Amino acid sequence: MESRIRARCPGPVAFVFSGGSSLGALHAGMLRAVHEAGIEPDFLVGTSAGALNAAFMAKGFTAERVRDLARVWTDLSTQDVFPGLGIWNSLRCAIGTGTLASPSGLKRIIERHLPATHAELSIPTAVIASDLATGSAVAFRDGDLRRHVLASASIPGVFPPVAAEGRTFIDGGVSSHVPLLPARDLGAKTMVVFDTGFP
């Protein structure tokens, strides 16, 4: 069965992860099914929550790593992402930065679970963020992985934009919620799509 599935998946094979905020937890179950089917990625592409999941899985597509990803999501709380959440803190953030929340919690999650650079990944990974000036999708493939994932997950109005590579970026889902075109442009012949169905 596994060999028949692989035969129908000409390479390069891209795993494509959609955004979806907390629904990114669904990717763990999808990954388990794909791993059991014996499909292996040549590279990964992710947007927003999917960028975090793609970068996490890029350390190695193993059953243990899939279980670890599920635990990351199971253990995650609202306070982890939005520390000190409350109307007064939100007002202070809105007055200071024009956004509802500080990115400090999201930064800590990223630093806890992801390596610092793309070069430390075992599987090549493209992180999709949206250029604030042009609205276009940009695929980051090398350099500061943590900053790229932070940019990709910076929901407009919730988190402040992120500066990277001399430009300013917001959530990748604004320009490419399911980053099929970036995956195609990077050479994918087969795409295995992990879509949360949101929005």
Annotate each PLM feature.
Residues 1-47, 55-199:
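Patatin-like phospholipase
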